[in-house]
Amino acid sequence: NFFFMILLSDNQKLIDYLIKHRDEIVDISVPYKRTDTRPFFNANTLLALSGDWQLLKERALTFLNDEKKARSDLKRIPDHEFYVALADKNIKGMQEALDKLLELKLAKRAAKGTLLHFDFYLQPQVLMYAKIAAIHGFDLGIDSPIAPKELIDINPLVEYKIPYDFMKSFDFDAPHQVWVNYVKQRMEEAKQKKVENKKGFWASLFGR
């Protein structure tokens, strides 16, 4: 989940990017659909980050009030209880919702399959939601072995170095689709180069 990575980085430029380009990254008009909830859930996360309280609460209640939720989505109930409390600026409600996700059994179930490199020792949902709360000025006082305070507190680096040259040309003010198209183009170029290298290998092997 790249939302998690960006939020935990405390990189304000990237966080602002998610907020500014929210409507390009997710479709906030996507309705709740039991058979495919991922787009609905992703949109809710960015609504929470951008502070669109009324719409966030309406959508969260739509999910919570559905008596026929998919069994696989029952683990997302605390997430949406958190959203309602966040929209209401209810610190106790936020704490109670995230406390449920810190209970070992539910913590494991909620984290499973979300973050391959972290979900076996961190609770990603709690970290992400507590970070969103912190961004909006709410200290929930959470400090757990699977959701340590050090990762929730906002502590940006003095400098964020860009590790790859191809990323240095990206304009964070450009539409999100520009970046998507750029990455697709690079992937196609890499694929074509691989095909050409393969042809060159066989040509050299058989003298053609």
Whereabouts are the PLM-identified features?
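Terminal, non-catalytic domain-edge segments
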Residues: 72-83, 88-91, 96-205
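Eukaryote-skewed repeat-based solenoidal scaffolds used as protein-protein interaction platforms
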Residues: 1-105
